[in-house]
Amino acid sequence: MNKLTHFDDSGQAHMVNVGDKPATHRIAIATGKITMLLETFKMVETGNHKKGDVLGIARIAGIQASKRTADLIPLCHPLALTHVSLEFRLDSTTSTISCKVRAETTGPTGVEMEALTAVQVALLTIYDMCKAVDRGMVMGDIKLLEKSGGKSGEWKLA
């Protein structure tokens, strides 16, 4: 198992020094989903929600969240993101909305946390916009699907 990098030799938390690492193009793709009542799902799917375009607002929230990740995760480096996109897939058979995020940067550290944060905030935004009609929505299956770039190279979830 690899050593935990956010702790120094005496066990104290610290921000990893990435100053000597080369800048490389880095990509991370993450996903998650939210399941809801069929009536709630139909409201989102048809765009008939009184608060407006639920998925459009969730997309903007996810992008904003990716840019604020370092403010939320204490030892996460602030990054200059070069691209963030969110894709939603609607499955009416399970009343589930899946969110997939692709985040990119060119720099000395990866964008996994930015992609994961974007997924979670997008799903939370859907929950927030729909909670008046469905408090029983369930978010889950949030995970990193793949990452590339840097010293560790390519990684894909098996």
From Swiss-Prot:
Keyword annotations: Lyase, Molybdenum cofactor biosynthesis
One MF term in the entry's GO annotations: cyclic pyranopterin monophosphate synthase activity
Residues annotated for substrate binding in this entry: L75, C76, H77, M113, E114
CDD domains according to UniProt: MoaC_PE (cd01420)
Keyword Glycoprotein: no
Pathway this chain belongs to: Cofactor biosynthesis; molybdopterin biosynthesis
Gene Ontology biological process terms in this record: Mo-molybdopterin cofactor biosynthetic process
Cell inner membrane as UniProt keyword: no
Superkingdom: Bacteria
Pfam families the UniProt entry points to: MoaC (PF01967)
EC number of the protein: 4.6.1.17
Self-association and partners: Homohexamer; trimer of dimers.
Protein name, per record: Cyclic pyranopterin monophosphate synthase
Gene name, Swiss-Prot/TrEMBL: moaC
